[in-house]
């Protein structure tokens, strides 16, 4: 793990090294146009075009999301107030949201009422047969676990050591992303 190497260098050479562990980062300029965009970008793009999004899960999976401006604010504090030796800091909201919860917020903020389609996670990965083959193919159950995992980070260390806490709640952050993505998508239509 990279953190262990960083800690080894910090310990061996007396270096100051801080690793930032990002939760799911979202914010304006998320790439919603690529073939397989991040969840937030995909959801906004499909709603913008009045299409039914297909989520490859039951929608109950929960993740911790952090708005990009909050991440930057913490990164700046870490640079301005470095701790001696090695440090690892979770950059997170300390809250988790399900696919269904985020979709409901985006649907409402965009003034839409489009029901999502929930499919088995295996349908998503079927588009990538190269993942399963070869000498180091990934087992389907590992990919399924990746889709269905729960993640929530504890940002107590960031709050206590760096005096930081996230300022942008999920609804405000999604609203900003929707605004930016809508402007971008409208620009493509001109």
Language model regions located:
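Short beta-strand/turn micro-motifs at beta-sheet edges
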Residues: 12, 43, 145-148
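The catalytic Tyr-centered alpha-helix of NAD(P)H-dependent dehydrogenases
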Residues: 2, 22, 36-40, 64-68
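Active-site Tyr-X1-5-Lys
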Residues: 1-18, 23, 47-49
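C-terminal substrate-binding subdomain of Rossmann-fold SDR/epimerase-dehydratase oxidoreductases
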Residues: 48-190
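Flexible, glycine-rich beta-alpha linker
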Residues: 15-38
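Hydrophobic alpha-helix immediately C-terminal to the catalytic Tyr-X-X-X-Lys motif of short-chain
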Residues: 1, 5, 9, 39, ...
């Amino acid at each position: 793990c990279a953190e262990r190497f960083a800690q080894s260098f910090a310990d061996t050479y007396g270096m100051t090294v801080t690793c930032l562990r990002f939760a799911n980062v979202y914010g304006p300029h998320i790439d919603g146009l690529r073939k397989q965009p991040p969840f937030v970008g995909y959801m906004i793009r499909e709603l913008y075009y009045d299409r039914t999004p297909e989520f490859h899960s039951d929608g109950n999976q929960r993740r911790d999301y952090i708005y990009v401006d909050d991440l930057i604010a913490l990164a700046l504090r870490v640079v301005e107030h470095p701790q001696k030796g090695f440090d690892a800091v979770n950059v997170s909201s300390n809250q988790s949201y399900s696919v269904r919860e985020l979709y409901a917020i985006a649907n409402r903020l965009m003034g839409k009422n489009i029901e999502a389609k929930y499919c088995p996670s295996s349908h998503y990965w079927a588009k990538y047969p190269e993942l399963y083959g070869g000498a180091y193919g990934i087992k389907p159950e590992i990919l399924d676990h990746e889709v269905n995992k729960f993640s929530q980070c504890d940002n107590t260390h960031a709050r206590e050591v760096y005096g930081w806490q996230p300022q942008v709640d999920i609804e405000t952050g999604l609203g900003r992303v929707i605004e930016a993505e809508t402007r971008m998508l409208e620009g493509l239509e001109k």
